[in-house]
């Protein structure tokens, strides 16, 4: 996330060119490259978690994330080590991507399996809620740094501070995860599938994986548009101050944190389907008009209003989407299947949202074009929801031939 916030500064440090657009694009493409590793992480680490347990897997993913984040934070720039600088930064992003490929799935499934009956949506929503805490933390640091550092200091070394501060939290997170108990549902399972069995089951359910990817695309594109890309869009495109852009990002993170548990709890009451259909439709129809209104007279107030509107879409859709994805996956490969679908969406669509948005604006000259990218994501989510909740569509474990238990516990529509 921090990488996306400071893409322009990181681009100048590791990808120096005479063309500012080229430098920014190289940085954003490196940001996106980490997401290409997520499907691989979902396969390898997801299988590990489905076989060895949730707790062990969450410790492993945290260790990998720590290595990737710290390596980028301490990496010398291009002027110091030349070609090795961008090469090693890309490597750090790949390690981050490998870990992140199963982080969301591992935590979401853990929360789903420890949730009390009838409150699964509320419990699982806190996985995404924890991401918003990171967004808020990064934005607060960004606001502080922009207030005390000159622009040249921020570009030279200030962007490293959030990465290093984030790395300092790792020991605390290790202690927290080490204290977690394994879920009763996993302990009760008599059969622990091998990696080959897990991969075979995932591939057998390829249609479910594709639909899960489409379902998740709405979430990932919206999230990275309003968080990772927001500071770049506000500063480089709308020419607002860094303080204004980061303040909007902070407000968006707080708004996300409010909407997610509320809508997760609401999905426990009314079902996942109505909320998914409603907010994917809003994501399809409203983004371009909202951004067109914003760019017609750019201001802090309008950027804040647009950001909060998209935050409402993200929080409301994601509050029911993540738990729904845990419910439709085959039981024995719940982490692997969830993570693979989620990682495909992030790797192919969400992670490259900042780069795609920048390219669309550069090629067309239309600063509202990112809205069409978000509308495309909304269409993906709406289509997947209608198919997955259609009468007769079967979810669940291929091996057992029955739907995932959670689908029966809670109403889908």
Language model features with spans:
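Extracytoplasmic gate region of multi-pass secondary transporters
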Residues: 3-4, 206-255, 349-354
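Extracellular/periplasmic helix-loop-helix junction of adjacent transmembrane segments
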Residues: 6-38
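C-terminal ends and interior cores of transmembrane alpha-helices
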Residues: 16, 63-81, 281-297
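Helix-to-loop junctions at the C-terminal end of transmembrane segments
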Residues: 42-54, 260-271
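Cytoplasmic membrane-interface "Motif A"-like loop-to-helix N-cap segments
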Residues: 51-63, 269-280
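Hydrophobic core of transmembrane alpha-helices in multi-pass small-molecule transporters
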Residues: 81-101, 300-316
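Glycine-rich segments within core transmembrane alpha-helices of 12-TM secondary carriers
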Residues: 122-146, 341-353
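C-terminal transmembrane helical hairpin of 12-TM major facilitator-type secondary transporters
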Residues: 274-320
